[in-house]
From Swiss-Prot:
Lineage, highest ranks first: Bacteria, Bacillati, Bacillota, Clostridia, Eubacteriales
Assembly description: Homodimer.
The keyword Flavoprotein appears for this protein: yes
Cofactor(s) it depends on: FMN
Protein name stated in the entry: FMN-dependent NADH:quinone oxidoreductase
Database matches in Gene3D superfamilies: 3.40.50.360
Organism superkingdom: Bacteria
Regions annotated as coiled coil: none
Length: 213
């Protein structure tokens, strides 16, 4: 059974969040076309996302083994167990959807902390002559980044301003996922009318994206 992993990073209720509203429309369309697909959801403001410590690792990006884990204090054992859980869940997915607002030219901090948890040696990356490479090219995977922003960002300056999108694209491609799509909810503005127009414009691309899955 294929798995769809939905990761949201916004404290707003779904009906108030433009990125989460569009992401839900996308998810519903995917599940309508693929009813047997399993959906898992991670809200990065509700799920505990550990901050990494040196004591959690035995080597570069490699989580401690079970013997070393047992020697850690119980609270640190719990943190390592959560990191492993998040990484294993990420690695098992076939389709990924992230819903995030654009904050300060990037994204909210919990998303970076989450990415740090799922980049693990032997699971999502490996090293060859001290050079890292991704392991998630082992099967067909699709990644869709849904991002909302208050302004309409001209495409010609988007690479310079949209640093969050650039980073997510680069790290996902580095992990080995070659199929990366963006679904931008630009121009949510300052009024509800502007927000709804931006949502409708972004949602008009959903059918095309779903057909590519």
């Amino acid at each position: 059974m294929k798995k769809l992993l939905y990761i949201s990073v916004n404290t707003k209720p779904e009906e108030m969040s433009s990125s989460k509203t569009v992401a839900r429309k996308l998810i519903n369309s995917i599940l309508e076309k693929h009813p047997s697909m399993a959906l898992e959801e991670v809200d990065l403001y509700r799920e505990h996302i550990p901050q990494l410590k040196y004591s959690y690792f035995e080597s570069r990006s490699a989580i401690v083994n079970s013997e070393a884990l047992a020697k850690l204090p119980q609270d640190e054992q719990n943190e390592v167990t959560q990191i492993i859980k998040l990484c294993d869940q990420f690695r098992a997915a076939d389709i990924y959807i992230i819903a995030s607002p654009m904050w300060s030219l990037s994204f909210p901090a919990p998303l970076k902390e989450y990415i740090d948890c799922v980049v693990q040696s032997g699971k999502t990356i490996a090293f060859d002559e001290n050079k890292p490479y991704g392991l998630l090219n082992d099967k067909e995977r699709t990644f869709i980044y849904v991002q909302s922003s208050g302004a309409n960002i001209p495409w010609i300056i988007r690479p310079a301003l949209n640093k969050g999108l650039n980073y997510v694209h680069d790290i996902i491609r580095f992990l080995g996922i070659s199929k990366f799509e963006e679904l931008l909810v630009d121009g949510t503005g300052t009024t509800e009318l502007e927000r709804q127009e931006a949502i409708e414009k972004a949602a008009s691309r959903i059918e095309t994206l779903v057909d590519q899955i």
